[in-house]
A protein has these predicted regions:
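Bacterial N-terminal signal peptides that target proteins for export
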Residues: 2-13
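Right-handed parallel beta-helix/beta-solenoid
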Residues: 24-52, 69
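N-terminal extracellular ligand-recognition/capping segment immediately after the signal peptide
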Residues: 35-37, 50-51, 59-99
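Short glycine/acidic-rich loop motifs that flank beta-strands on beta-rich extracellular proteins
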Residues: 74-76, 97-98, 112-122, 143-151, ...
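Right-handed parallel beta-helix/beta-spiral solenoid domain characteristic of secreted/periplasmic
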Residues: 82-157, 161-162
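Right-handed parallel beta-helix
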Residues: 89, 130-143, 157-164, 181-195, ...
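Acidic, glycine- and Ser/Thr-rich low-complexity intrinsically disordered tracts
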Residues: 96-107, 111-113, 164, 293-425
């Protein structure tokens, strides 16, 4: 018995030493597109791009990234990291201070050329636990998309061989896959102009882990604004998602005739969720989609508006926000949710395109909808446009038109109704 206890103590001590050693060896690196050269990645001699450092990163490291536009190593448009790290953007070029959505924007994008990557812009898939964080990055896939015509009003899902262009990437901005028993955070990011089939933010929890998604602006994307996945298929030790103070606007269907995509938040089945103080607005389908029936989730103090078919869905039951407490079976402690005709300062040019786009059987959709403030004139009013007697016009042939970073950030700078959604960090 004594020997067994000694053996277990020795193994525990060794494990503690390994963890302590790993933390002690963690490095802090610096990246600047303006000054960067080589791989020292110090504050005085920063690297040029995150992609140039990936091979030397270890669990526990931190990468600080200065303002500027980053297209990835060799302009690949995608970075994939297999260790647990912190990625922190929004720094001044001398790393003296941060302003991620203002003066010191760290913009992750790419270029569209035949043969380039169409993967998620940033993929983080560690195998061990350490602090995992993506904070203060502006993800803009506009330059990576293939548009029909110079006005950039319609994305193309096909390659344009004559112009040496890839299809628009069918992936989003962030893909985070947690290992078992680990925690991770996505905060203070802007995700825009992505055209995924799945999530613009694709977040994968695992056994006994916690994934926090807070104060992000997710705007003008196809697919699901945030897709919460579970890698753990069990009713025990399900991964927990804490999704709070995010603003998710203009979630488009995959294309004009698609029957998928177009939700602010979509849920996998085997997970635990608390979503609070978010804005889920202008989804081509809905606000929160629980079609897979995640059990006993909490939606508290969220604002739903302008979604076309439902504010919340359980399997094939569509529910308006005013009916959550009566009609939903899988919600618990889900009070304080509401709707409001908010004013979204997204810019007049984009507002006119969005409100004037062609709609498929709009009248039929409105007739069966269980969503709040989803009428054509309500939408125009929230976008700051004059009301029209005839509803949505059918003369704008657009699909995911490119939105400027300035106009996007205007829509997320302050909370709506003083309480809901993100704000400038």
């Amino acid at each position: 018995m004594h020997g067994g206890l000694s053996g277990r103590f020795a193994r525990l001590l060794l494990a503690c030493c390994v963890v302590t050693s790993s933390a002690a060896l963690a490095e802090e690196y610096f990246v600047s597109i303006a000054r960067g050269k080589g791989k020292d990645a110090t504050k005085d001699k920063p690297a040029k791009d995150l992609g140039n450092l990936i091979a030397k990163l270890k669990d526990g490291d931190t990468v600080n990234i200065a303002e500027g536009v980053y297209a990835g190593r060799d302009e690949s448009g995608s970075d994939s990291i297999g260790v647990a790290v912190k990625i922190v953007g929004g720094w001044a070029d001398d790393f003296s201070g941060r302003d991620p959505w203002g003066a010191h924007r760290t913009i992750f994008t790419g270029v569209n050329t035949m043969g380039g990557s169409t993967q998620y812009r940033l993929i983080l898939s560690p195998t061990n636990c350490a602090e995992i964080l993506i904070d203060g990055i502006v993800f803009d896939n506009g330059p990576r998309n293939n548009y029909q015509g110079d006005k950039e009003l319609i994305i193309s899902r096909m390659a344009t061989a004559g112009k040496n262009r890839n299809p628009s990437p069918e992936s989003g901005a962030i893909k985070l896959e947690l290992p078992k028993k680990c925690a991770g955070t996505l905060s203070n990011n802007v995700v825009m102009n992505t055209a995924p089939t799945g999530g613009a933010i694709s977040a994968w929890g695992h056994q006994g882990g916690t994934l926090t998604i807070k104060n992000n602006l997710v705007i003008n994307n196809t697919g699901e604004g945030i897709f919460a996945y579970s890698k753990w298929k069990s009713n025990k030790e399900q991964p927990r998602f804490i999704i709070e103070n995010n603003t998710v606007l203009f979630s488009w269907k995959h294309d004009s005739i698609a029957t998928y995509g177009g939700n602010g938040l979509k849920l996998d089945q085997d997970l635990l969720l608390t979503a609070s103080n978010n804005v889920f607005a202008f989804g081509d389908y809905g606000g929160v989609d629980n079609i897979k029936l995640a059990k006993k989730i909490t939606l508290k103090d969220n604002l739903f508006t302008g979604n076309r078919l439902y504010d919340y869905r359980e399997f094939n039951t569509s529910v308006k926000v005013s009916e959550f407490e009566d009609e939903a079976d899988q919600l618990e402690a889900s009070t304080g949710n509401l709707t409001a005709e908010i004013k979204v300062p997204v810019g007049e040019a984009f507002a006119k395109l969005y409100a004037g786009r062609k709609e498929i059987s709009r009248a039929a959709v409105d007739a069966k909808a269980k969503a709040s403030n989803n009428g054509a004139n309500a939408l125009r009013g929230m976008l700051g446009l004059a009301l029209q007697a005839n509803g949505v016009a059918d003369d704008a042939d657009v699909w995911l038109p490119r939105l400027s970073i300035d106009d996007a950030i205007k829509a997320g700078t302050t909370k709506y109704e003083g309480k809901y959604g993100c704000q400038k960090p």
